[in-house]
């Protein structure tokens, strides 16, 4: 059972974070939080999203899960005002979630959880390098890199104390180095991995709204992006597998 009220901004930020990677997911809820963990169809990227009950203006729930069609939730956006309060309600055993705001009432059919890809296990991999930069800065580099290539290198250069993003195309290239004064660095450890820009553009659009994004990185390992939503009452983690170039 779930009965909750949430602002339109937080609702949209949450749905957008999920839709950057997946079209459907299991949504879990308990007395204290709502959470989802899902991978894309190619098993290349993962999202782990949590909203504490404090993200809601009203929250009442018992432990359970439902299968969400994220595209259907996005279809409700067009009628939402920025100041709208969104009422969400699901009765235990029902196959619908009720979404109500400003006189509108959507009754959205749920997906069978058994038909949705199983929740992935959170990876236990240790990524030695870590930097924190603004989400908008990160997205700007990704957009610029997409003009010249479909892939981008992320690197930490400890000797220079720089976090470097660069892309190489057939004839052009782009490089952006963030100095120690531009980033918050927890670990200036050597790191360098190559990633698909297609995935990063979708993630980056979501991350562009975050004041700070923490990036954990290794050598030819996945990258992890962590950032807050809902005024600090929510957390999103994206993990993206590297592209391995043939010698």
From Swiss-Prot:
One function term, GO molecular function aspect: DNA binding
Gene3D superfamilies listed in its UniProt record: 3.70.10.10
Domain of life: Archaea
InterPro entries named among the record's database cross-references: DNA_clamp_sf, Pr_cel_nuc_antig, Pr_cel_nuc_antig_C, Pr_cel_nuc_antig_N
Keyword terms of this UniProt record: DNA replication, DNA-binding
Keyword DNA-binding included in the entry's annotation: yes
Disulfide bonds: none
Name of a matching Pfam family: PCNA_N
PANTHER family reported for this sequence: PROLIFERATING CELL NUCLEAR ANTIGEN (PTHR11352:SF0)
Function of the molecule: Sliding clamp subunit that acts as a moving platform for DNA processing. Responsible for tethering the catalytic subunit of DNA polymerase and other proteins to DNA during high-speed replication.
HAMAP family: DNApol_clamp_arch
Protein family membership: Belongs to the PCNA family.
Subunit structure: Homotrimer. The subunits circularize to form a toroid; DNA passes through its center. Replication factor C (RFC) is required to load the toroid on the DNA.
Name of the protein this chain belongs to: DNA polymerase sliding clamp
